[in-house]
């Protein structure tokens, strides 16, 4: 007889007919994302896994390690390369057009210096989404990253490409920048996908309200 049960985030068996999907929503925030990294490590250390993840900006870049189940990786490589100009620096911005060096962050680190576990990522069935801002429409677009291969990494980079400090990323017919501009906390997006319960990891106080960036009019000069 088929066992029609699933397990919730506590590992308890629940009837699939009444199963309520639990999502994990990760806000961005550049290096404030180290807080997110710590939360994700604690969740993994306690074997708490949700049914899906959506990340924005740093939440996307760091959240992929939750799907690949690499405890400590985010904090480890950030500590190792924090002082390396190729990782994040004004020199990188002037030399490459990106304050976070695209080749170093999305090629050298995951493929050579602190290897990302692609096989574990692909074998893990939970869906992982990122959010990015469409430069042409001003709307948020969402992408499910199936393999974390080259094309998926372009979407991840786009999600974390801060305006004024990064080049727009062109992928799949879009020209994209940081998803935090259009949907910094994509809770509503996940609720529409059927995730009725969600763990939301914030990197700002709950009463924080985003104000217009006075430098945004100068973006057209880049």
Task: Name these PLM-found stretches.
Residues 1-56, 64-222:
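Patatin-like phospholipase
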């Amino acid at each position: 007889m088929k066992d029609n049960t699933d397990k919730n985030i506590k590992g308890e068996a629940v009837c699939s007919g009444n199963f309520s999907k639990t999502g994990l929503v990760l806000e961005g925030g550049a290096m404030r994302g180290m807080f997110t990294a710590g939360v994700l490590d604690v969740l993994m250390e306690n074997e708490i896994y949700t049914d899906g993840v959506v990340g924005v900006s740093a939440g996307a870049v760091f959240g992929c390690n939750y799907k690949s189940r690499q405890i400590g990786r985010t904090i480890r490589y950030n500590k190792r390369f924090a002082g390396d100009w190729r990782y994040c620096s004004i020199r990188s911005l002037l030399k490459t057009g990106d304050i976070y060096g695209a080749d170093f962050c999305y090629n050298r680190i995951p493929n050579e210096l602190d290897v990302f576990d692609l096989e574990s990522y692909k074998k893990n069935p939970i869906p992982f989404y990122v959010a990015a801002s469409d430069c042409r429409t001003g709307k948020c677009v969402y992408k499910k990253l199936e393999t974390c291969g080259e094309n998926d990494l372009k979407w991840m980079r786009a999600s974390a490409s801060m305006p004024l400090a990064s080049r727009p990323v062109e992928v799949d017919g879009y020209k994209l920048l940081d998803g935090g501009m259009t949907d910094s906390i994509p809770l509503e997006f996940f609720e529409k996908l059927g995730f009725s319960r969600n763990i939301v990891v914030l990197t700002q106080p709950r009463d924080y309200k985003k104000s217009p960036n006075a430098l945004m009019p100068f973006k057209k000069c880049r």
